[in-house]
Amino acid sequence: MAKEKKIRADFRKNRADRPRRKDVLRHLDPEELDEQALPRVERVSGKGELSRKRTVRVTGETAEGELPAQLEVDESACRRGRVLSVRGLRSIVLGDDGQVYHCATRRVLMTLDTGLRHAVAAGDRVLFRPVENTNPKEGLIERIEPRHGTLSRSVRGQQQVIVANIDQLAIVVSVDEPPLKPNLIDRLLVTAEKGRVRPLICINKIDLADLAELQPLIGTYSQMGYTVLPLSAKTGFGVERFARALAGRATVVAGQSGVGKSSLLNVIDPTWNLRVRPVSQDTLKGRHTTTNAQLLPLGCGGYVVDTPGVRQFELWDVVSAEVANFFRDIRPYICLCRFPDCTHTHEAECAVKNAVADGRLDARRYESYCRLLADESEDAQD
């Protein structure tokens, strides 16, 4: 059992400043004014306006070595559950009793200064206090258990955890409508490598192209050890293999809008009846049908998380110096460069650039690395 510690955790400052009264003497009669009875100091701000601290319990360490802060709660009055989806300030939680609860989040969890955009994410394991005699059943989330295997992105400089407690990332792209974006695959692969989750590359709508034309792309990723699945939600091609890859795992499905994420999941389990919409013929871009990440239990064990479509994906907590280490094909050449801090872009005697020139390293993948590196360098300067 993990060793428990206690630490002092910071809380966010109150969002609103207390207004200063401008009419404190308006109701007084000047002739009856007793200056001796008036207070000498007006208190403008209380402790709530300052950075607050509270003792929280710490159990063990995360994979990244960060201590997960947990509030002490009365566990005997709580149930355990998993968050199915988050909608605004409410979370849909599947309790350990098999019941679904509509839960609010304890305010102190929302004010913990964690740097996260939202306190709760789909897939979170939580301790919640049920509210008696409510229909539908309601509860209050008291504690969020330590996470592992998260899919996060950067939104306005803050970490947005899209889903937590996963062990597989299914990256869904389409051959056409919308067009295939290998660079988005590479970004999501970096996210998977960073989060230590197994990536699964799913190429949907292969009925719109000749499979032979995709072999160079499929071969590039397969040689690096990635599993690549050509699929068609329309014809059912490859869907059985996709279902076997999901069985018994906690998988998040991510990709652009319109690539057919929800359509593929509907083929696997029609009872989910996920909403789908055709691609816009004007822009050739997908339309959002999934607005919140939602957890869907699988009958064969495990679960999948359908996520809203992404057109751009900004990496979270990846510095430019780390990017090359998350490219499996570039990694073997890093130690062969002349300079230990080589960025593999302009330096002399760079083993990575030499491998590209000799054809040992895919040129498109190298261009994708350079583009991602430039994006991360710009973010670091902002």
Predicted feature locations:
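Canonical P-loop GTPase G-domain recognition
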Residues: 198, 207-259
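Conserved beta-strand/loop subsegment of P-loop NTPase cores
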Residues: 166-173, 195-204, 225-230
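A conserved segment at the C-terminal end of the G1
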Residues: 261-277
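Conserved hydrophobic/aromatic pocket- or pore-lining residues that grip, position, or stack substrates
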Residues: 192, 246, 264
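C-terminal effector/interaction modules appended to NTPase cores
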Residues: 1-193
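Helix-rich effector regions associated with P-loop NTPase G domains
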Residues: 1-52, 74-77, 115-125, 130, ...
